[in-house]
């Protein structure tokens, strides 16, 4: 069945800067915002934008992500024609061919794309937090008669060297692209969101794949090649909320952003819902002794202590006399009686011991509490007690 536009969602990244949060799961599967996973935002954007055919390309630690996505029913993508399809690397006659870059991942799934004979292909990343109407971007792409359109956002000049940076003319046509430049000429950063005319994308994926010196990456190889060959690349300016949650600190910041009174993400906006898999937990319980303010408290939580400006995921327990401030407590974790937690991300199923304290040594830092961190902390406490 022919589709005007289909999406290819890149979800195979490890996210090593998130440290132990991605030891056993892919970055797009990391919990976020009390009840979601990072990939929920991109999948929900597709649903809300009317993109009903999505290929999800997975590779690193994919099992939980595959189980979570299932047949796509949580995002209304369980369709007979189209819907969501998980696309891990697979074995061919020459052996298993791992994805070797973002462009190579799409190249290896040309047959999947061809069955829909699309006019346009939307390439997405599954590891950013944002809301976007992709239909508006597609309309812009068509109006500009572009070969490729790249969504861009203005970033602070001091951070521009961390991104792929676009230089454009007055018509927003891209005249120069630099990947993480030491001296950026612009602060228009690529968001890793592309719309290509499918015939042209197919042609250049094949050219790139045949180049043994290519890293097979859209930003490093394919886009510069299009510029060299004088194609029509345009930048699509995006002005909403967008966060690259690639570090522990940025993940914590994005969760805290949700608690701002006028935050741009607004999880309660019924006109642009963020869908997720229902955890099937009982209602949360807030005891008479508890004090909760400026926080997100999800299903299945039991709160008997004090919670201030924090995000509690499903099944979290906060004991009597415990205090939690500016923290993210992930699914199934517990803060025991009398414990104190501030500016921390507590990983799933971790248990903070009674009357212990968790807070960063540097006031601007964030503590990532894991089983290994707790073990080391307990050993240090035991040594101090012995002394």
Swiss-Prot record:
Record bears the keyword Zinc: no
CDD domains cross-referenced by the UniProt entry: ADP_Glucose_PP, LbH_G1P_AT_C
GO MF terms, alphabetically ordered: ATP binding; glucose-1-phosphate adenylyltransferase activity
EC class (word): transferase
Cross-referenced Pfam families: Hexapep_GlmU, NTP_transferase
Enzyme Commission number: 2.7.7.27
Domain of life from the UniProt record: Bacteria
InterPro entries given in the database record: ADP-Glc_PPase (IPR011831), ADP_Glu_pyroP_CS (IPR005836), GlgC_bac (IPR023049), GlmU/GlgC-like_hexapep (IPR056818), NTP_transferase_dom (IPR005835), Nucleotide-diphossugar_trans (IPR029044), Trimer_LpxA-like_sf (IPR011004)
Binding site for alpha-D-glucose 1-phosphate: 99, 164, 179-180, 190
Pathway: Glycan biosynthesis; glycogen biosynthesis
Catalytic activity entry: alpha-D-glucose 1-phosphate + ATP + H(+) = ADP-alpha-D-glucose + diphosphate
Gene Ontology BP terms: glycogen biosynthetic process
Database matches in NCBIfam families: glgC (TIGR02091), PRK05293.1 (NF003670)
Matches recorded under HAMAP family: GlgC
Subunit: Homotetramer.
The protein's role, per its UniProt record: Involved in the biosynthesis of ADP-glucose, a building block required for the elongation reactions to produce glycogen. Catalyzes the reaction between ATP and alpha-D-glucose 1-phosphate (G1P) to produce pyrophosphate and ADP-Glc.
Name of the protein this chain belongs to: Glucose-1-phosphate adenylyltransferase
Record lineage: Bacteria, Bacillati, Bacillota, Bacilli, Bacillales
Gene responsible for this protein: glgC
């Amino acid at each position: 069945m022919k589709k005007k536009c289909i999406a290819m969602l890149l979800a195979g990244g490890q996210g090593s800067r998130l440290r132990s949060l991605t030891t056993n799961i892919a970055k797009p599967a990391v919990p976020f915002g009390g009840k979601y996973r990072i990939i929920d935002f991109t999948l929900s954007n597709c649903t809300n934008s009317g993109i009903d055919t999505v290929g999800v390309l997975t590779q690193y630690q994919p099992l939980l992500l595959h189980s979570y996505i299932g047949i796509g029913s949580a995002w209304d993508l369980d369709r007979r024609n189209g819907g969501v399809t998980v696309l891990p690397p697979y074995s061919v006659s020459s052996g298993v061919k791992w994805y070797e870059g973002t462009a190579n991942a799409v190249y290896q799934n040309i047959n999947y794309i061809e069955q829909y004979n699309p006019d346009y292909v939307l390439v997405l990343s599954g590891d950013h937090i944002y809301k976007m109407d992709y239909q508006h971007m597609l309309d812009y792409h068509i109006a500009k008669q572009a070969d490729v359109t790249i969504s861009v956002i203005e970033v602070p000049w001091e951070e521009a060297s961390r991104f792929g940076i676009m230089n454009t003319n007055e018509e927003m046509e891209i005249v120069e692209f630099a990947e993480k430049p030491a001296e950026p000429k612009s602060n228009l950063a690529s968001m890793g969101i592309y719309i290509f005319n499918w015939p042209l994308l197919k042609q250049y994926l094949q050219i790139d794949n045949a180049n043994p010196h290519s890293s097979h990456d859209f930003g490093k190889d394919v886009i510069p090649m299009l510029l060299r060959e004088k194609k029509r690349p345009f930048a699509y300016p995006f002005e909403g909320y967008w966060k690259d949650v690639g570090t522990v600190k940025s993940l914590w910041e994005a969760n805290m952003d949700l608690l701002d009174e006028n935050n741009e993400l607004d999880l309660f906006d019924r006109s642009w819902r963020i869908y997720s898999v229902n955890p099937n937990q009982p209602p949360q319980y807030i005891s008479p002794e508890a004090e909760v303010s400026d926080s997100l408290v999800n299903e299945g939580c039991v709160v008997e202590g004090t919670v201030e400006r924090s995000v509690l995921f499903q099944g979290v327990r906060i004991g009597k006399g415990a205090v939690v401030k500016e923290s993210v407590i992930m699914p199934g974790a517990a803060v025991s009686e009398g414990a104190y937690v501030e500016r921390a991300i507590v990983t799933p199923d971790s248990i903070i011991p009674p009357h212990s304290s968790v807070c960063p040594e540097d006031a601007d830092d964030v503590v990532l509490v894991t089983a290994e961190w707790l073990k080391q902390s307990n050993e240090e406490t035991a040594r101090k007690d012995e002394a």
